[in-house]
């Protein structure tokens, strides 16, 4: 099924078409609810996707949960995709059964999800786990969210690419520019990681900063939330897995010694099935919450 059509209404239509296909595939099996994770802030009480839906702007302001309930006559729940992913790790992952878990997802952007004492942390308006836009450098550059020095600027795919593009315009970044065919706009995170692995100084500086920024956030999470498990996942986590020693060394600089000793940090690159499990986990979680 094509999933990358663009324009007003196309994202909702794609979701509905996919759900139709899944319902046909379910056959006689009972469907108890629908879960959807979207890369945006979601007001879960109202079921409305927020204005910050930069990756799916056609969904901004859409009451998707209500629309799906009406369309399919089933309970339907919509939340941030990394919140859903955290529920999947908590319910289905290798560490299922723990009471507290934090997911940090480094992909194009940087998201996070928090489960404490068996409850998903959303905050008052759905902003409760936006650690990707917590500052790790108070005098850092402006972020696309409107803040400054956010973690996403340093440890997301977009942030790593943009930092490398800036360096590519300097003398020390000549190799970065050459690797991109002379066009800095073609620099992406995989290229930066590859050049850093080959020893290029400019690329190495970008990746060093990414590791330190991620380590600083691990320190914040360990000291502030004291979870049993932190899972680092997402498309960029594949590259961070090879740098695990550097990331953990940075985390050890910022976290209380006894607190970090009690927190297991796992770098586990996800896949599309992880997102599907997240959608299912969200529906199960919300249905169970109704019974409390």
Language-model features: locations:
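Active-site-adjacent loop/helix segments that line or gate small-molecule/cofactor pockets in enzymes
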Residues: 82-86
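Active-site glycine-centered loops adjacent to acidic/histidine catalytic or metal-binding residues
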Residues: 81, 107, 279
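Short beta-strand segments
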Residues: 35-39, 102-109, 113-115
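A charged helix-plus-loop insertion that forms the helical arch/lid used to bind
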Residues: 47-61
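Structural signature of FAD isoalloxazine-binding scaffolds in flavoprotein oxidoreductases
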Residues: 127-130
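Short clusters of small/polar residues that mark proteolytic maturation junctions
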Residues: 1-2, 53-54, 125
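ATP-binding/phosphotransfer module of carbohydrate and carboxylate kinases, centering on a glycine-rich
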Residues: 1-33, 43-48, 66-74, 88-98, ...
């Amino acid at each position: 099924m094509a999933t990358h059509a663009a324009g007003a209404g196309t994202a909702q239509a794609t979701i509905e078409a996919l759900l139709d296909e899944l319902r046909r595939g379910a056959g006689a099996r009972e469907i108890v609810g629908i879960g959807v994770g979207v890369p945006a802030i979601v007001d879960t009480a109202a079921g409305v996707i927020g204005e910050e839906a930069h990756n799916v702007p056609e969904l901004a302001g859409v009451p998707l949960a209500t629309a799906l309930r009406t369309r399919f006559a089933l309970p339907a729940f919509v939340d941030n995709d990394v919140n859903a992913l955290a529920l999947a790790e908590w319910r289905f992952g290798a560490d299922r059964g723990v009471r507290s878990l934090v997911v940090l997802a480094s992909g194009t952007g940087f998201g996070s999800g928090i489960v404490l004492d068996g409850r998903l942390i959303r905050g008052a308006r759905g902003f409760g786990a936006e650690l990707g836009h917590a500052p790790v450098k108070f005098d850092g550059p402006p972020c696309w969210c409107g803040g400054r020095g956010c973690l996403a600027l340093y440890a997301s795919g977009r942030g790593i690419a943009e930092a490398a593009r800036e360096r590519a315009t300097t003398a020390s970044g000549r190799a970065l520019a050459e690797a991109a065919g002379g066009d800095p706009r073609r620099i992406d995170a995989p290229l930066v990681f590859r050049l850093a692995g080959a020893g290029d100084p400019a690329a190495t500086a970008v990746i060093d900063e990414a590791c330190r920024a991620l380590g600083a956030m691990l320190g914040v999470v360990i000291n502030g939330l004291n979870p049993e498990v932190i899972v680092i996942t997402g498309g960029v986590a594949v590259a961070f897995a090879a740098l695990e020693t550097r990331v953990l060394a940075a985390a050890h600089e910022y976290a209380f010694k006894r607190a970090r000793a009690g927190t297991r940090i796992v770098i586990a690159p996800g896949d599309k099935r992880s997102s599907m499990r997240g959608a299912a986990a969200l529906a199960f979680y919300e249905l169970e919450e109704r019974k409390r």
